[in-house]
Regions:
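NTP-dependent small-molecule kinase module
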Residues: 93-95, 99, 108-149
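Phosphate-binding P-loop
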Residues: 1-7
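Glycine-rich phosphate-binding loop used to anchor ATP phosphates in small-molecule kinases
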Residues: 29-82
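A glycine- and Lys/Arg-enriched "phosphate-lid" helix/loop adjacent to the NTP-binding pocket
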Residues: 67-113
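Hydrophobic anchor at the beta1->P-loop junction of P-loop NTPases
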Residues: 12
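Hydrophobic positions on the alpha1 helix immediately C-terminal to the Walker A/P-loop
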Residues: 23
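Conserved glycine(s) of the Walker
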Residues: 19
Length: 149
């Protein structure tokens, strides 16, 4: 639900190398840093809590409630083909922890968590050109502001 006097918080989520940071950086430049923007927050924390069998879920859920009561939140779930994620990891000389190597399983966990936890989210296919992705996101943010959510 959009609340007029609260700032918009845009949270970029998704598996490693799904394009979050690139999209965030270009979005910030194109919007002149007009929004509160985070690269990951509770969605990643909750997912990794499960994959790594941590016992912090209650803390993440409490923190999430606090964020949702303080901001108008838009979660941006960055997705791309698994083979592109593997290629990006290889090009960056990065490796996933053993428990995250089933990228499709991790992607499905992100999709489910975002769908279960947030009413206001957009899925961006980052296999497309960055300008196309940013324009789609700006359109969604503008709609959010114009339609009060």
């Amino acid at each position: 639900m959009y609340i007029k006097d609260k700032p918009i918080l845009i949270i970029f989520e998704g598996v490693d190398k799904s394009g979050k940071t690139t999209l965030k950086d270009v979005f910030n430049k194109k919007t002149n840093f007009s929004y509160v923007v985070l690269d990951r927050l509770t969605t990643s924390s909750k997912i990794y809590n499960n994959f790594f069998e941590r016992n912090r879920l209650k803390y993440y859920e409490e923190f999430e409630r606090s964020v949702l009561s303080s901001f108008n939140v838009l979660v941006v779930l960055c997705e791309c083909e698994t083979n592109l994620i593997i290629e990006r990891l290889k090009n960056a000389n990065e490796f996933l922890p053993e428990k995250l190597k089933d990228i499709d399983k991790v992607k499905a966990a992100f999709r489910k968590e975002v769908d279960d936890s947030f009413s206001n989210y957009v899925v961006i296919d980052t296999t497309r050109e960055i300008e196309e992705c940013v324009n789609e996101l700006i359109k969604r943010v503008n709609e959010m502001e114009e339609n009060n959510g």
